[in-house]
Design a protein with these regions (language model features):
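Walker A/P-loop-proximal flanking segment of P-loop NTPase domains
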Residues: 36-43, 50-53
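An aromatic-glycine-centered, glycine-rich loop/turn in mixed alpha/beta architecture
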Residues: 1-39
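A short linear-motif detector with a strong N-terminal bias
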Residues: 12-15, 28-31, 41-44, 69-71, ...
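Switch/coupling segment of Walker-type NTPase motor domains
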Residues: 47-135
Length: 135
């Protein structure tokens, strides 16, 4: 089927989502980071589900790669914001300092005292954290 023919209705079938995919409404939102929507189309009926990654699965080798501008930082921001909203702890390593500035806006006032920012380049407030202290 040629894609350049005018006045043709094309239906593209995608594979259905896996049966154990964590979806909104079927999974505990505090245990899933929702990150997108499926694009499953069956005949003329669209079935789109909001899906995510289970927190226990995120503990194992989650690797986000892509070229500039494809949304790697936005995906991380989405997951971190959900973790903060559900009261989970977060550790962010930000070599440029821009990501943490965006995230600080989403920390509730009652939790702001729990935030610890370690900036090795800050000469006014040097860090007393020594990762090699007990090595």
């Amino acid at each position: 089927m040629a894609l350049n023919k005018p006045n043709k209705i094309q239906i593209i079938k995608y594979a259905p989502p896996p049966p154990d995919l964590p979806t909104l409404g079927q999974s505990d939102p505090s245990e899933v980071s929702f990150i997108g929507r499926t694009n499953y189309v069956a005949s003329l009926e669209e079935k789109k589900f909001v899906f995510g990654i289970k927190r226990v699965d995120r503990r194992r080798h989650l690797y986000i790669i892509g070229k500039s501008g494809v949304g790697k930082s936005k995906l991380q921001e989405l997951m971190v914001r959900q973790d903060i909203a559900y009261g989970h702890g977060v550790c962010i390593i930000d070599p440029h300092g821009e990501f943490i500035d965006d995230i600080l806006e989403f920390i509730p006032e009652e939790r702001i005292e729990d935030v610890c920012i370690i900036d090795p380049g800050d000469i006014d407030f040097p860090s007393s954290f020594n990762p090699l202290a007990n090595v």
